[in-house]
């Protein structure tokens, strides 16, 4: 959470990564389920009390693995004081095949694709689309700007901030970028993934006008999954399926739907 210098004491999520809030350390393997739930409940309740005693306004998204909202829902239960609000969001996890000897068409990941996505992949391969690793952050930013300029819509994120995020991830060794080009070498799409010890996260994507006439938008993800699989990544979080078009496209890759929540509380004026 980030403190914001507004009239009221405010702590809100930065907005630059999808998830935030409370994260738990691995539990003692000798604890049973009841003990784990009880311990997490007490920890969450303590954090809630600390936050609400310190800040007037609080807002953050939970992680999909954070499932127990009861301490938030029961805060000031049967009292007049402020109550937490929450709204439901979704992302999708794609499990990648662990057995590297299995060709991509035989993987469980491929079998979970919907019909139209399989067709796009077949067309993309037949047309000679090639996907490769890229370290060119400046090129990504240029294509990102082109994407929004072409569509005549406001930028979702400021380019300088994106560059800073990508550079920081790259220096830490936690950035994987891919570019997909047509058979004549024209780049159509680029995708940027962050990674940690648990999974990889699709954080930014960008398309040139070439993507509208080819399958590079599909292939940069599909081929990217295969390259991620061979680099040891076992799961990909496509980070958000919360609008119709974006949701359909990402879910067509056959991932598991995962809920998470935006939690907030507004104090008295």
Each language-model region and where it sits:
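Residue-level detector of family-conserved "landmark" positions at structurally sensitive sites
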Residues: 60-61, 134, 158, 238, ...
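A conserved beta-strand-loop-helix scaffold within acyl/acetyltransferase catalytic domains
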Residues: 1-8, 63-213
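Short, structured secondary-structure boundary patches
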Residues: 152-157, 255-261
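Conserved catalytic-core motifs of GNAT/GCN5-like acyltransferases
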Residues: 86-91, 256-268
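Acyl-donor binding region in acyl/amide transferases
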Residues: 5-81, 199-255
């Amino acid at each position: 959470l980030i403190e914001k210098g507004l009239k009221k004491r405010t702590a809100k999520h930065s907005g630059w990564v999808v998830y935030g809030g409370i994260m738990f350390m691995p539990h003692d393997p000798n604890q049973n389920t009841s003990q784990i739930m009880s311990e997490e409940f007490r920890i969450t309740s303590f954090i809630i009390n600390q936050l609400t005693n310190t800040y007037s306004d609080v807002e953050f998204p939970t992680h999909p693995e954070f499932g127990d909202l009861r301490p938030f829902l029961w805060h000031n239960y049967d009292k007049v004081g402020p109550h937490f609000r929450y709204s439901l969001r979704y992302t999708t996890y794609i499990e990648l095949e662990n057995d590297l000897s299995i060709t991509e068409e035989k993987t469980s990941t491929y079998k979970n694709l919907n019909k139209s996505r399989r067709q796009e992949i077949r067309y993309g391969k037949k047309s000679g689309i090639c996907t490769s690793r890229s370290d060119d952050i400046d090129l990504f930013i240029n294509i990102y700007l082109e994407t929004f300029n072409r569509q005549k819509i406001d930028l979702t994120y400021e380019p300088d901030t994106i560059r800073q995020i990508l550079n920081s991830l790259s220096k830490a060794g936690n950035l994987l970028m891919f570019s997909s080009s047509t058979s004549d070498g024209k780049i159509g799409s680029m995708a940027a993934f962050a990674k940690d010890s648990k999974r990889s996260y699709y954080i930014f994507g960008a398309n040139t006008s070439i993507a509208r006439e080819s399958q590079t938008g599909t292939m940069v993800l599909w081929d990217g999954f295969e390259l991620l699989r061979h680099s040891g990544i076992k799961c990909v979080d496509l980070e958000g399926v919360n609008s119709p078009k974006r949701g359909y496209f990402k879910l067509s890759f056959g991932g598991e739907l995962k809920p998470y929540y935006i939690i907030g509380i507004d104090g008295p004026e």
